[in-house]
Regions:
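N-terminal basic/disordered segments at the start of proteins
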Residues: 36-75, 96-97
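Conserved, well-ordered active-site substructure
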Residues: 387-388, 396-445
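Short, low-complexity intrinsically disordered segments enriched in A/P/G/S/L with frequent Arg
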Residues: 3-5, 10, 24-28
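C-terminal structural cap/anchor segments
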Residues: 335, 339-393
Length: 460
């Protein structure tokens, strides 16, 4: 984990390595820092918020916006996250939206661009991880980059380029049935190669244990052969620390949020940022509380069942929905009297069989758009009805709800656990949000998080 003896040792080794070769880059003194050292482009809001929360927990001030145009208006944070809903949209649209974010961050002078995507590398052959990375290579001027989706603490690991969920290849896991991005090929070298003209190679696990010098030599040899993209084997937390030490000076890096936890120690060791931690806090937020769930992940279904033991839950059947407006009106009529007695849950989440039936009727994208449209419009109506605390399950759902609510900038709290980000809007009548990855979080997360929002110490 970030701050561990292993990561500190690697950071020190990294510093000694460069000083001994007179490669240290002159840095600005702390008091005159005006350029961010780390610019993150996240392909969904849950992951973007998680990344920001990890940096904040490490004492790194981090701005968080959903509109690239707002990057210029931020103060002088050393890190900025631009989170957009691009994970499952067509590649050309994802590239266009990412270009706006990248240009905004580079215009601020970002020292490194980090493209954040999911630990399960959610992407089909028509996916956009490859095209977006191609764009970022061009804009950043990077000659090569690596791909590190792994999250060892959650048993999302990569070995010989193959992605595992626990002991299962991802193609043998429930992710093979994902309604939007079914993962049927576990070989990430193959998956990525089908999305890009850049040659894809592998940083095999034995190299990670050999040290930085052998890693750099291997990369130099492979790039001489034309390789530009490297899938990084990652099994242990120490592998993430090694990869962070290797890539902290790269113009472009890509991966899951977990590797980001290891950068702050390196930045501090190099004098890029002050060693003193900031002490962020989020205010308590009152008002009614609601769970809005759109994810069909097994973990979200378990969390809904747990929440329902003590709180009412409405499940919206997409096959019976007579359009967005009708479904929203019916859900609002159901929720209003119940909110007087405590939090409620409203979900479009369904079993895989039910999802398949909805997709047969509406198409894959049509079913997703219907569900997101219902929950997004419902969030607006619920806010008008006095709801100020929202727990949202699902990355695509989170993006839709934040967009419908017109939220463009958030004050993010420190990291609260894998896949979980908590934030408040910066306004006189704030809204508290927990944007949760569909696949992650403890079973009792919904009720405990809504309760914690009532107390500032609960979301600090």
């Amino acid at each position: 984990m970030a701050g561990s003896p292993a990561s500190k040792e690697l950071a020190l080794q990294y510093l000694i390595y460069h000083v001994s070769r007179l490669e240290a880059v002159p840095e600005r003194p702390f008091g005159r820092m005006t350029k961010p050292i780390f610019g993150v482009i996240a392909d969904d809001l849950t992951g973007g918020m998680e990344t920001a929360a990890m940096l904040i927990a490490a004492g790194i001030d981090c701005g968080f916006v959903t509109e690239p145009d707002l990057v210029a208006s931020l103060g002088d944070p050393p890190a900025i996250v631009v989170a957009q809903k691009t994970r499952v949209i067509p590649a050309d649209r994802a590239v266009a939206k990412t270009e706006r974010a990248a240009r905004a961050l580079l215009a601020r002078g970002a020292r490194q661009i980090f493209f954040k995507y999911c630990a399960t590398f959610d992407s089909t052959d028509r996916g956009n991880i490859g095209p977006v990375s191609d764009l970022l290579m061009q804009l950043s001027g990077a000659e090569y980059t690596a791909f590190c989706p792994a999250s060892p603490a959650l048993r999302r690991t990569v070995y010989n380029g193959h992605l595992f969920l626990g002991t299962e290849l991802i193609s043998e896991s429930p992710k093979r049935n994902d309604p939007l991005t079914p993962m049927t090929d576990p070989d990430l070298v193959r998956v990525l190669q089908r999305q890009t003209q850049n040659k894809v190679g592998l940083l095999a696990h034995p190299l990670l244990g050999a040290g930085l010098d052998p890693l750099k030599r291997a990369i130099a040899e492979e790039t001489a052969r034309g390789v530009r993209y490297f899938i990084a084997d990652t099994i242990y937390e120490r592998d993430l620390a090694t990869l962070a030490a290797l890539t902290s000076d790269w113009k472009l890096m890509t991966g899951n949020a977990t590797i980001v936890q290891h950068y702050p120690e390196i930045w501090k060791a190099r004098g890029l940022i002050p060693t003193a931690k900031t002490s962020p806090s989020l205010p308590a937020v009152g008002g009614a509380g609601v769970v809005l769930a759109g994810s069909c992940a097994e973990r979200t279904l378990e969390q809904l069942a747990e929440f329902e033991k003590c709180h009412p839950v409405l499940r919206i059947d997409l096959l019976k929905a007579d359009g967005v407006e009708s479904a929203v009106a019916a859900a609002l009529d159901w929720a209003r009297p119940r909110l007087e007695n405590g939090p409620v849950g409203i979900a479009t989440s369904e079993s895989h069989d039910a999802v398949n039936l909805a997709q047969q009727r509406y198409g894959r994208e049509g079913a997703a758009q219907l569900a997101e449209g219902i929950l997004g419009r419902l969030a607006v109506s619920l806010r008008s009805a006095g709801v100020r605390r929202f727990v949202v399950a699902g990355g695509e759902t989170s993006g839709s709800i934040v967009d419908h609510l017109g939220i463009r900038r958030l004050r993010v709290g420190p990291y609260g656990g894998p896949g979980i980000g908590t934030a408040v809007t910066d306004e006189d009548d704030p809204v508290a949000l927990c944007l949760k990855s569909g696949k992650l979080g403890p079973v009792d997360l919904f009720a405990t998080t809504l309760q914690s929002m009532l107390h500032p110490e609960g979301i600090n």
